[in-house]
């Protein structure tokens, strides 16, 4: 069985992968996740996912190459602006006000590096989300849950944030942070399949 590495410490991504009953290791990447506003959001998520996977792959390549690295990066796009994770309450407030009462797009880039062949696949998934109109008081109440601070766009669709998401068009798991359908399509291109319960 191939050694599977998830290049992320995200609790959401870990839980999503765990549900398939496959064994995997968690080796978080340590890259600079700064957003390049001169690039498209698609280019940003794919570039960041690839950097994460490549960094972890390079750490392990001297041991042996019988492993598979999976990395992902999620960003939000609204009115021409790319949103990452807020670094403080003011930034979270600004982001939540920005997405309040309108549609925005969530993009997740996924990169898989197949160790034995050093084959690299990078793709992305897009979902559209409509956030209900929130008063400043509601925004502050949501921020007080502390949920926004490690989430792109300052909300979690599977937590308290589910109470502000009015509609979604596209893959739900993409908004959580790991588009499972897209991930499995990519794995199938490399000869693997999550449906089989092993890699």
From Swiss-Prot:
According to its UniProt entry, the protein's GO biological process terms are: nucleotide metabolic process
- The species this protein belongs to is Caldicellulosiruptor bescii (strain ATCC BAA-1888 / DSM 6725 / KCTC 15123 / Z-1320)
What InterPro entries does the database record attribute to this sequence?
Answer: ITPase-like_fam (IPR029001), Maf-like (IPR003697)
Residue positions of the active site: 73
Could you tell me what reaction this enzyme catalyses? Answer: dTTP + H2O = dTMP + diphosphate + H(+); UTP + H2O = UMP + diphosphate + H(+)
Keyword match Metal-binding? no
* GO molecular-function term, one example from the UniProt record: dTTP diphosphatase activity
Q: Which domain of life is it from?
A: Bacteria
Keywords tagged on the record: Cytoplasm, Hydrolase, Nucleotide metabolism
Q: What is the lineage of its organism?
A: Bacteria, Bacillati, Bacillota, Bacillota incertae sedis, Caldicellulosiruptorales
Q: What residue stretch is flagged as signal peptide?
A: none
As for what it does, the entry says: Nucleoside triphosphate pyrophosphatase that hydrolyzes dTTP and UTP. May have a dual role in cell division arrest and in preventing the incorporation of modified nucleotides into cellular nucleic acids.
Q: Which GO terms describe its cellular component?
A: cytoplasm
Q: A single Pfam family, by name? A: Maf
Q: Where is this site: Important for substrate specificity?
A: 12, 74, 158
| Gene3D superfamilies assigned to the protein according to its UniProt record, in alphabetical order | 3.90.950.10
Q: What does this protein need as cofactor? A: a divalent metal cation
Q: Could you tell me which SUPFAM superfamilies the record lists for this protein?
A: ITPase-like
Which family is this sequence assigned to? Belongs to the Maf family. YhdE subfamily.
Q: What is this protein called?
A: dTTP/UTP pyrophosphatase
Instruction: Write the Enzyme Commission number(s) for this entry.
Output: 3.6.1.9
Q: Where in the cell is it found?
A: Cytoplasm
